[in-house]
Amino acid sequence: MKFDMLWSKIHRATVTDANLNYVGSITIDEELMEAAELLVGQKVEILDVNNGERFSTYVIRGERGSREICLNGAAARKVAIGDKIIIVAYAQYDRSELSSYKPTVVLVDEKNDIVQIKHEV
């Protein structure tokens, strides 16, 4: 049996832009992507702390060091610039893998600078 478990998350990132005319996705600073072990094209869930919205999209690489968090396309209507969001990725694990299970949690400040990286829920 496979279990859907947290793979990684970027916790309380600040939305820096919302681009309605782009073809969908979330643009994430490359450094934040690497810290959270996210891949280009990977499906993620977006949880908006300010308005309660929850939706899925996929990741595209943003400029390294820009601290960009930009919702694109239709998702741009679900957030406002300045909103705090949680970007969550899941993976499937076999029960045997769960004994060493350690998700990656990236904590950021209001400027999307990395404050801490933890490997626990």
From Swiss-Prot:
<keyword id="KW-0963">Cytoplasm</keyword>
<feature type="active site" description="Schiff-base intermediate with substrate; via pyruvic acid">
    <location>
        <position position="25"/>
    </location>
</feature>
<dbReference type="GO" id="GO:0005829">
    <property type="term" value="C:cytosol"/>
</dbReference>
<dbReference type="InterPro" id="IPR003190">
    <property type="entry name" value="Asp_decarbox"/>
</dbReference>
<dbReference type="GO" id="GO:0015940">
    <property type="term" value="P:pantothenate biosynthetic process"/>
</dbReference>
<dbReference type="Pfam" id="PF02261">
    <property type="entry name" value="Asp_decarbox"/>
</dbReference>
<comment type="function">
    <text>Catalyzes the pyruvoyl-dependent decarboxylation of aspartate to produce beta-alanine.</text>
</comment>
<feature type="binding site">
    <location>
        <begin position="73"/>
        <end position="75"/>
    </location>
    <ligand>
        <name>substrate</name>
    </ligand>
</feature>
<keyword id="KW-0210">Decarboxylase</keyword>
<dbReference type="GO" id="GO:0004068">
    <property type="term" value="F:aspartate 1-decarboxylase activity"/>
</dbReference>
<keyword id="KW-0566">Pantothenate biosynthesis</keyword>
<keyword id="KW-0865">Zymogen</keyword>
<protein>
    <recommendedName>
        <fullName>Aspartate 1-decarboxylase</fullName>
        <ecNumber>4.1.1.11</ecNumber>
    </recommendedName>
</protein>
<comment type="pathway">
    <text>Cofactor biosynthesis; (R)-pantothenate biosynthesis; beta-alanine from L-aspartate: step 1/1.</text>
</comment>
<keyword id="KW-0068">Autocatalytic cleavage</keyword>
<feature type="active site" description="Proton donor">
    <location>
        <position position="58"/>
    </location>
</feature>
<dbReference type="GO" id="GO:0006523">
    <property type="term" value="P:alanine biosynthetic process"/>
</dbReference>
<keyword id="KW-0670">Pyruvate</keyword>
<comment type="subunit">
    <text>Heterooctamer of four alpha and four beta subunits.</text>
</comment>
<feature type="modified residue" description="Pyruvic acid (Ser)">
    <location>
        <position position="25"/>
    </location>
</feature>
<comment type="similarity">
    <text>Belongs to the PanD family.</text>
</comment>
<keyword id="KW-0456">Lyase</keyword>
<dbReference type="InterPro" id="IPR009010">
    <property type="entry name" value="Asp_de-COase-like_dom_sf"/>
</dbReference>
<keyword id="KW-0704">Schiff base</keyword>
<feature type="binding site">
    <location>
        <position position="57"/>
    </location>
    <ligand>
        <name>substrate</name>
    </ligand>
</feature>
